[in-house]
């Protein structure tokens, strides 16, 4: 952790505290013990009207000018929490995370949850498009699409094998189409849409199959295939093996939407 302050300073000696217990983490089955480092504190004098920029980062921030530029950009992005709606908008923005390597991800929930394809697709319209941040929506979708394998979303996205997650992708694109138009959707995401449908037609990892009746069958003993994804001793509490109603509703929507865009833009493949 890199700590810096924009002026001469004095930093007191660090120390370490041992054996912190987190009862909620233990109750949820997580490792609930941790040692914590205190970095001490900066000590300096301020005159009337002066300001100080303090930074904490995983990488070195660089020059004082760089820190000032980052600080100014951060201030410009902030929302003014003056009423209920602005507080909601501010909270929603905290779930959109930009990471190194041109990655934009959506955290499913603080403090325990990571990145989930399903939760990303379901939440993106509300936390980006409704606030006028379509570029964030596009960046998050592009991050997941770059890491697609065999029609499923992998990378850092948890629940990558769930049968419904890739199909929520189509629903999110339908919301994005209102902002950018169908032509751009098909140009940017048409190949991914066709890859997903083709993977379901072929079958995915012995867990997802398209049957002759046109319905999607999803079943597995070791991983949850739907949003009911609680595990006990490494096995799904509610497996729901078979024709899940929401999976097939999403499947029907995905097929219809893909055919609609393909027809409008002359793609017969």
What are these regions (language model features)?
Residues 42-60:
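Short Pro-Gly-centered flexible turn/kink motifs
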Residues 16-24, 29, 52, 59-60, ...:
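Extended glycan-interaction surfaces of carbohydrate-active proteins
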Residues 26-45:
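Short acidic, Pro/Gly- and aromatic-enriched capping/linker segments at domain boundaries
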Residues 118-120, 124-226, 244-248, 252:
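Aromatic-rich carbohydrate-recognition surfaces in CAZymes
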Residues 248-269:
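Active-site neighborhood of glycoside hydrolase catalytic domains
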Residues 40-48, 238, 242-243:
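Exposed beta-sheet edge/beta-hairpin loop segments within beta-rich domains
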Residues 2-5, 9, 13:
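Single conserved hydrophobic/aromatic residue that forms the stacking wall/gate
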């Amino acid at each position: 952790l890199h700590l810096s302050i924009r002026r001469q300073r004095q930093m007191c000696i660090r120390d370490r505290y041992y054996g912190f217990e987190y009862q909620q983490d233990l109750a949820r089955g997580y490792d609930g013990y941790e040692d914590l480092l205190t970095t001490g504190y900066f000590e300096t004098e301020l005159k009337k009207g002066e300001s100080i920029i303090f930074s904490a980062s995983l990488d070195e921030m660089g020059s004082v000018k760089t820190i000032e530029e980052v600080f100014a950009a951060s201030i410009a992005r902030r929302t003014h929490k003056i009423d209920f709606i602005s507080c909601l908008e501010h909270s929603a923005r905290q779930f959109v995370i930009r990471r190194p390597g041109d990655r934009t991800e959506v955290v499913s929930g603080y403090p325990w949850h990571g990145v989930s394809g399903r939760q990303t697709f379901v939440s993106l319209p509300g936390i980006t498009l409704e606030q006028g941040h379509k570029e964030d929506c596009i960046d998050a979708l592009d991050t997941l699409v770059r890491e697609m394998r065999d029609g499923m979303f992998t990378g850092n996205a948890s629940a990558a094998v769930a049968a419904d997650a890739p199909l929520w992708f189509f629903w999110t694109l339908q919301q994005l189409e209102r902002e950018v138009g169908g032509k751009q959707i098909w140009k940017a995401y048409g190949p991914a849409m066709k890859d997903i449908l083709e993977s379901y037609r072929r079958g995915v990892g012995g867990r997802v199959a398209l049957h002759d009746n046109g319905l999607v069958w999803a079943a597995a003993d070791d991983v949850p295939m739907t949003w009911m994804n609680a595990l006990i001793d490494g096995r799904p509490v509610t497996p729901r093996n078979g024709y899940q109603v929401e999976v097939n509703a999403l499947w029907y929507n995905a097929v219809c939407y893909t055919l609609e865009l393909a027809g409008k833009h002359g793609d017969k493949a």
